[in-house]
UniProtKB/Swiss-Prot annotation:
Family to which the UniProt record says this protein belongs: Belongs to the triosephosphate isomerase family.
Localization: Cytoplasm
Enzyme class, first EC level, given as a word: isomerase
A Pfam family recorded for this sequence: TIM
Protein name as it appears in the record: Triosephosphate isomerase
Gene name in the database record: tpiA
PANTHER family: TRIOSEPHOSPHATE ISOMERASE
Pathway the protein contributes to: Carbohydrate biosynthesis; gluconeogenesis; Carbohydrate degradation; glycolysis; D-glyceraldehyde 3-phosphate from glycerone phosphate: step 1/1
Major localization class: cytoplasm
Catalytic activity field: D-glyceraldehyde 3-phosphate = dihydroxyacetone phosphate
Amino acid sequence: MRTPLIAGNWKLHKTIAESLAMVDELKPLVAGSRGVEIVVAPVFTALKSVSFALNGSDIGLAAQDCFWEEQGAFTGEVSPAQLRDAGCSHVIIGHSERRQLFGETDEGVNRKARAAVAVGLTAIICVGETMEERESRATFTVVGRQVTAALAGFLSHEFSRIVIAYEPVWAIGTGKTATDQQAQEVHCYIRNLVTMSISQAIADSLRILYGGSVKPDNIRGLMAQPDIDGALIGGASLKAASFAEMVNFRG
């Protein structure tokens, strides 16, 4: 049984004060949630403060990115160990915005994920195709390449700290959402790929999230699909009431 994971990616939003206010509003709204893992990902500067604010709650803390080196002359980067020190339990890696805007590569995603898992963080690894790739019927080719590259080199026991998030680039911040069936089709493909390339047991336990304009009015249909194990939520996670409604998708 895969525990659903609902993750809120706040992207480049909220000051420290605004992040703390959001957490204070959110905590009582999700305090009674059972059978679901909850994670929020504020900006780097708010991580430590939000970590203290989440203490004693059932909400986990994620960073939005990391670097693969532990330390050194890498100006502007943050290591997985430093994120753990700031209170993080999770880190988002390879988000489409990182790939599209900052040239993140499949190799870089793999190096970051391996470094994160090595220090005990759960890596939420993002994959997904552009609209051009979907229209040219390259969705499975692109997603397959990204998943295969991202999961290279992991040992069997490390997969418990890996989550895949399928986020079609054409649905990020556009208001467009993959239909329940479109999302399920790709999630099923990812799980079958892991079955064939790694093992049935790992595929069965691997959580695969959907990301891409997830909102309170579409999350229930998505979560009803057999291979969708949660959601990576952007804009709709910025308001406590909206995010809490999605955490409590079961009603």
